[in-house]
């Protein structure tokens, strides 16, 4: 059974269709090449014609998509040719193929490649039978790169064989999946037909034109960002062509988590190595530079489609502003192209004359239900309540607050149908993401304070909100909600008073506040905002109505200005706006002009008043700003080099320059120095409490014991000051026993390579590995050196006289400083095609190459650590620390390998602290994902410390 197939499910669900090439053009599946045999008239010639097709052969597989074939033969007959008439061979193919048994294999069965390798178990090689298993491209570097070569290995990894794979074996082409036919990887189109070249478009539609999906792009920028993890964006299930790119090189780290808060990589404040991950039903490729000096950018890409929602996170390590762009493609919902602008008006009847009825509570837990992806709303039968669905996103998002930002922030999302242009903030549609800031406005012509209570139940189309739910009348209060931190946007449209414009003022009783509503963070600020669709969205936040009574806002409605005698067609028109600022302050940018809808008197109104079909296209022009000046950029300061006494902190200082829009790169320091910019300091002194003389220890040496044997490892012990000042009774031990590795290590060899020359000069080489019983490659020191197979043999086309043959050098016998390396030098000859070892005199001892040579590794820098300090707590979980220093001789230096630096700080878990009676008033609020809040370390935030009071309590309290 082929349990390892990589074929999409849709392809196997299609019926197999036989493909036969007709006409004069032979197909790739043909296994014979027709020849032309045309004779002039009068001579005897041979006539050719096709015989009948044979029956279809048995399917090459029992499931998973095999191959069956038919053959026909070209028949011939000698006859007299007719003058002037050409006689040709059979034209076409003699063999044709089709797919068969396309149903999926049981998931717990063997793969088809495994079945083929297992079939060799009964065969004898070199006098013994082996157990064989397949090697796949992901876990072995093939001897052959042909996709239809079957690679098998013995279970112990000591032997490999390569044979042609059977027909029906899965293979992979560049942009199509395929199947092996007669040793060649033939394509299977997205229509499930063999030899078809039909491909999926970017929307995942077979032979589609790319118009059935929406391309979502956005960018994440935050000023004064808090340390720790923050949500960049939520990627819904079904997303394709995912790209998340960190545009500005920084110490930030991208991470990926599911909707429950489980991290796939770079989570829990640990950085994983860049590699490919199998996540959400697709391969996610994560790459990043290994250090700040390495070129390249950090990015996450995946082809998709995903089978679950994903949260893209960023781990901010220095509080600087990140710059991240993201994009992905989603299949369009049926309503996406036809979502009308939505206005929500509150009838005057809903507001009574008394103060108690004018003020209504805003149900913040349902506010985010205001916008739905299909533009519909929910209502309740009560005439005083407008129902809104509390589930803005599908699937539900994790309820995690990512920290308020008091500085500048802009996290924009733009959605477009394929082939369209994404320009500026979206208008008149809903655009979704998780890191959203909500805006809510309420207007009353008498400047009365007013708010609304939102609940959700019955589905109601947005087109009928005004008339069926909110009543009629020319004078009404209008409500608009814009979610703009990720540009989630619902733009109002007129119902019965199109000439009115709404402006909102805020009265501040205190500074900006924040609320968490269904997992989305809403920040409140006092910026003045109007409801025009051209209002700027980035860097702007607004507030929902007051929840605690400490904030009020007023609104005023402009009087209607309807011109008598002006026809509806002339009432509104499109007008090109003035040029927007250049998109770049330096280098070449783009300056855009957009159309805006204006009234007859020149007042800008909502775009929905004008005819969308006559809207002018945006105009884009290049604009040249000044050249970007180089600048110094610094990393964050390292920890102090010492936990006591005087030490040093270091940071990296590099010269950076914006070379082109969006391309920021490190450059030579000379450029920054030429501008006379002051270079920041790379080192500064740090002082901790004085420390007396203390013992310092290096790391343990490597155990040199052979398998199953015992030996001793050692470490250096030194006093931080004069040796006499340290207490001898507290001196740590300098050696301890160790045990060698298990005795399952064995030498494994590859096949011999080609011969490099003739007799006396030819060499053939193979690779020799030390492997465990499960096939893992380990250092050669774990295998017996005495039994290591030779990696170099003499070779040639005739017998060779004895000559010296040197093997490869072994590793240097020291990890630092000066040492010795050795190699094996043998006297060998080639006799009857086989290499033979001879005695040294036959080769001439005077000509023997050296077997030893000096070697020099990096300077002997070595890490030393002091003993652990006392735990910072007497009960519960605390922290203990130690000094970590890098020495070269007696000098403290910076040359040690940071990858093997010992930890200088670790948690210490002592006995539980005395418990107190539980506080029943401290409970978690329903609907708050407290498990996720704890996982991303948000208990210190003011909201979660209350909303997750019970979960965030210290342990044992």
From Swiss-Prot:
Q: Name one GO molecular function term.
A: microfibril binding
Q: Which residues form the TSP type-1 domain?
A: 47-106, 570-624, 628-692, 694-742, 743-801, 803-857, 859-914
Q: What main location does UniProt list?
A: secreted
Cystine pairs:
59-100, 63-105, 74-90
Its localization reads: Secreted
Q: Which InterPro entries match?
A: ADAMTS/ADAMTS-like (IPR013273), ADAMTS_ADAMTS-like (IPR050439), ADAMTS_CR_3 (IPR045371), ADAMTS_spacer1 (IPR010294), PLAC (IPR010909), TSP1_rpt (IPR000884), TSP1_rpt_sf (IPR036383)
Listed A to Z, the keywords are: Disulfide bond, Glycoprotein, Repeat, Secreted, Signal
User: Which PROSITE patterns does the record match to this protein?
Assistant: PLAC, TSP1
Q: Which stretches are tagged as biased composition: Basic residues?
A: 551-563
Q: How is it modified after translation?
A: Glycosylated. Can be O-fucosylated by POFUT2 on a serine or a threonine residue found within the consensus sequence C1-X(2)-(S/T)-C2-G of the TSP type-1 repeat domains where C1 and C2 are the first and second cysteine residue of the repeat, respectively. Fucosylated repeats can then be further glycosylated by the addition of a beta-1,3-glucose residue by the glucosyltransferase, B3GALTL. Fucosylation mediates the efficient secretion of ADAMTS family members.
Compositional bias ranges of the Polar residues kind: 532-544
Tell me which residues are glycosylated: 87, 374, 435, 482, 518, 530, 539, 550, 737, 813
Start and end residues of each stretch annotated as Disordered = 532-568
Signal peptide start-end? 1-29
- Span of domain PLAC: 918-956
Gene3D superfamilies, alphabetically? 2.60.120.830, Thrombospondin type-1 (TSP1) repeat (2.20.100.10)
What do the Gene Ontology cellular component annotations say?
A: extracellular matrix; extracellular region
What start-end ranges are recorded for coiled-coil regions in this protein? none
Domain of life of the source: Eukaryota
PANTHER family the UniProt entry points to: ADAMTS A DISINTEGRIN AND METALLOPROTEASE WITH THROMBOSPONDIN MOTIFS PROTEASE (PTHR13723), ADAMTS-LIKE PROTEIN 2 (PTHR13723:SF147)
Q: How is the quaternary structure described?
A: Interacts with LTBP1.
Its recorded name reads ADAMTS-like protein 2
Its lineage opens with: Eukaryota, Metazoa, Chordata, Craniata, Vertebrata
């Amino acid at each position: 059974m082929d349990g390892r197939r990589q074929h999409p499910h849709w392809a196997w669900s299609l019926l197999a269709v036989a493909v036969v090439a007709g006409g004069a053009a032979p197909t790739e599946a043909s296994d014979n090449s027709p020849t032309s045999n045309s004779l002039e008239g009068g001579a005897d010639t041979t006539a050719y014609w096709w015989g009948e097709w044979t029956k279809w052969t048995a399917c090459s597989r029992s499931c998973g998509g095999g191959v069956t074939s038919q053959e026909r033969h070209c028949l011939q007959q000698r006859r007299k040719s007719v003058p002037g008439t050409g006689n040709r061979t059979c034209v076409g193919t003699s063999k044709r193929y089709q797919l068969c048994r396309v149903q999926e294999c049981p998931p717990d069965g063997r793969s088809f490649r495994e079945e083929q390798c297992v079939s060799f178990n009964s065969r004898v090689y070199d006098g013994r039978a082996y157990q064989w298993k397949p090697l796949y491209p992901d876990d072995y570097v093939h001897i052959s790169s042909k996709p239809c070569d079957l690679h098998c290995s013995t279970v112990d990894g000591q032997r490999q064989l390569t044979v042609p794979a059977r027909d029906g074996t899965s293979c992979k082409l560049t942009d199509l999946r395929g199947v092996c036919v007669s040793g060649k990887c033939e394509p299977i189109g997205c229509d499930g037909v063999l030899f078809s070249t039909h491909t999926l478009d970017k929307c995942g539609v077979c032979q589609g034109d790319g118009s059935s999906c929406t391309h979502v792009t956005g960018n994440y920028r935050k000023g004064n960002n808090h340390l720790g993890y923050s949500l960049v964006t939520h990627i819904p299930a079904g997303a394709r062509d995912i790209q998340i790119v960190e545009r500005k090189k920084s110490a930030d780290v991208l991470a990926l988590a599911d909707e429950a808060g489980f991290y796939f990589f770079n989570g829990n404040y640990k950085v994983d190595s860049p590699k490919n991950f199998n996540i959400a039903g697709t391969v996610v490729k994560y790459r990043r530079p290994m250090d700040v000096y390495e070129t390249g950018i950090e990015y996450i890409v995946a082809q998709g489609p995903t089978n679950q929602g994903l949260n893209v996170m960023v781990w901010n390590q220095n509080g600087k502003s990140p710059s991240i762009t993201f994009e992905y493609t989603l299949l369009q919902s049926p309503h996406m192209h036809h979502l009308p602008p939505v206005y929500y008006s509150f009838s005057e009847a809903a507001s009574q004359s008394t103060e108690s009825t004018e003020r209504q509570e805003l149900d913040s837990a349902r506010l985010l239900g205001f916008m739905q992806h299909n533009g519909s709303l929910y209502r309740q039968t009560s005439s005083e309540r407008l129902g809104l669905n509390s589930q803005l996103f599908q699937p539900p998002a994790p309820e995690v607050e990512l920290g308020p930002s008091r500085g500048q922030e802009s996290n924009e999302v733009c959605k477009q149908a394929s082939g369209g242009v994404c320009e500026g903030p979206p208008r008149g549609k809903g655009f979704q993401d998780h890191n959203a800031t909500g805006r809510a406005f309420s207007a009353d012509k008498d400047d009365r304070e007013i708010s609304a209570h939102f609940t959700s139940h019955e589905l109601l189309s947005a087109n009928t909100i005004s008339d069926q739910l909110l009543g009629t009348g020319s004078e009404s209060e209008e409500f608009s909600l814009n979610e703009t931190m990720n540009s989630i946007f619902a733009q109002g449209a007129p119902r019965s008073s199109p000439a009115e414009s709404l402006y909102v003022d805020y009265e501040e009783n205190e500074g900006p506040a924040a609320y968490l509503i269904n997992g989305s963070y809403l920040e409140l600020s006092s910026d003045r905002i109007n409801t025009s669709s051209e209002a700027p969205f980035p860097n702007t936040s607004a507030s929902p109505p007051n929840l605690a009574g400490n904030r009020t806002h007023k609104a005023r409605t402009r009087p209607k200005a309807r011109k008598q005698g002006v026809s509806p067609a002339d009432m509104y028109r499109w007008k090109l706006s003035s040029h927007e600022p250049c998109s770049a302050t330096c280098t070449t940018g783009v300056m855009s002009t957009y159309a805006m809808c204006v009234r007859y008197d020149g007042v800008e109104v909502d775009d929905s008043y004008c005819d969308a079909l006559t809207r002018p296209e945006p105009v884009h022009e290049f604009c040249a700003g000044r050249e970007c000046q180089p600048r110094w950029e610094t990393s964050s300061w390292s920890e102090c080099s010492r936990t006591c006494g005087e030490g040093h902190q270091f940071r990296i200082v590099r010269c950076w320059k914006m070379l082109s829009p969006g391309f920021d790169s490190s450059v030579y320091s000379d450029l920054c120095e030429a501008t006379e910019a002051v270079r920041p300091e790379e080192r500064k002194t740090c002082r901790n409490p004085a420390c007396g003389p203390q013992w310092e220890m290096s790391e343990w040496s490597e155990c040199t014991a052979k398998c199953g044997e015992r030996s001793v490892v050692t470490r250096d012990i030194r006093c931080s000051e004069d040796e006499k000042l340290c207490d001898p009774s507290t001196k740590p031990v300098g050696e301890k026993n160790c045990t060698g590795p298990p005795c399952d290590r064995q030498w494994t060899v590859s096949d011999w390579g080609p011969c490099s020359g003739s007799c006396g000069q030819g060499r053939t080489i193979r690779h020799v590995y030390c492997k465990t019983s499960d096939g893992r490659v380990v250092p050669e020191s774990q295998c017996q050196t005495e039994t290591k197979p030779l990696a170099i043999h003499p070779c040639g086309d005739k017998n060779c006289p004895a000559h010296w043959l040197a093997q490869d050098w072994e590793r240097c016998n020291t990890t630092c400083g000066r040492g010795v390396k050795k190699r094996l030098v043998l006297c060998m000859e080639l006799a009857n095609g086989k290499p033979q070892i001879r005695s040294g005199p036959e080769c001439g001892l005077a000509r023997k190459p050296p077997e030893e040579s000096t070697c020099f590794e990096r300077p002997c820098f070595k890490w030393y650590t002091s003993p652990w300090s006392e735990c910072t707590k007497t009960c519960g979980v605390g922290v203990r620390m130690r000094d970590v220093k890098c020495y070269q001789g007696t000098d403290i230096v910076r040359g040690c390998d940071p990858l093997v630096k010992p930890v200088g700080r670790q948690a210490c878990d002592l006995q539980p602290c005395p418990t107190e009676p539980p506080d029943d008033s401290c409970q978690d609020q329903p609907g708050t994902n407290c498990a996720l809040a704890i996982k991303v370390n948000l208990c210190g935030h003011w909201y979660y410390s209350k909303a997750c009071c019970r979960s965030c309590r210290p342990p044992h309290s």
